[in-house]
Structure formats: structure tokens, C-alpha cells
Amino acid sequence: IVVGSFGKTFHVTGWKTGYCMAAPELMKMFRQVYQFASFCAVTPVQMALATFMQQHPEHIEELAGFYQQKRDLFNSGLKNSRFQFTPSQGTYFQNLDYSAIRPDLNDVAMCTFLAEQHGIVAIPISVFYQQAPENLRLIRFCFAKKDETLQQASAILSAV
């Protein structure tokens, strides 16, 4: 089963439109559940995405390079920071290890600290665990942003 969103792929995050692909027998069940889980789809948005995909098939082919440039821009701004990281692959999120900065804070507290003290928002990695490791000191940033936003964010983070 593949479930995804068109939001970041086509730079329309506010459209809240996604997709599901699976074997026919699973899709039949999915459609039955979806019928009651969602009131209605936004047909004009679906049509706009379908038209764009037909008219611009190259968009998907260029996407990896587009996001690699975004990742590299964000990460290059963090080179002189105290955050540790391995450049991400296959995603538009970058995890940062902050254990050299505030090892006393868990990831939720670190995200709160960054938001309240520095005006920058991160996602705690622990939300993706049923039971996170106690020493987890990772936070996540999305680099599917404007270049100016990435430069500003990396400058703020480098000063932490």
C-alpha cells in the first residue's frame, strides 16, 4: 500500500489532496472506508492536479534535484552550527541532533525552547515512536520552503 500527498510534490500544501495505491482488492476496501471518512473531495483541485501532471510530466523527474538543492542550501547554512546531522536522502526533511547544545532537554522541550526563544519551529522525532528512546535528541525540519526561509532558519539555528 502506498499513501501519499500531492502537497509538497506539486508545491500546493494547502490543497490537502493525496492518493492511495494498492492491489485492487485492497483499493475496494479503501474506497469503502474513504466514503465514510471524508465528506467530499475538492474536485477542482483534483482536476487541476491531473491537468498539471499531464502537461508537465518532467516535474516529477526534476523533483529530486529540486529538493536536493533545498537540502544542500539548508545544510550548508548549518555547517558552522553545533547541530550534528547526516544529509537526508529521499525526503524533504532533515533531522538534527542537538545533543551538543541542550542535552538536558528532551525533543519536545527542545522544540518548545526553539519556538519560544528563537521563533523557529521543529518537529520532535519522538512523535513518530510508540515509545521513544530516552536519550533521543533529534528534531526534524522540513526544507520544502522558500530559499529565503531556509537561509533565515539556518542562520537562527547556527546562533543557538
Q: Which residue stretches match the model-derived regions?
A:
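PLP-dependent class I/II
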Residues: I1-V160
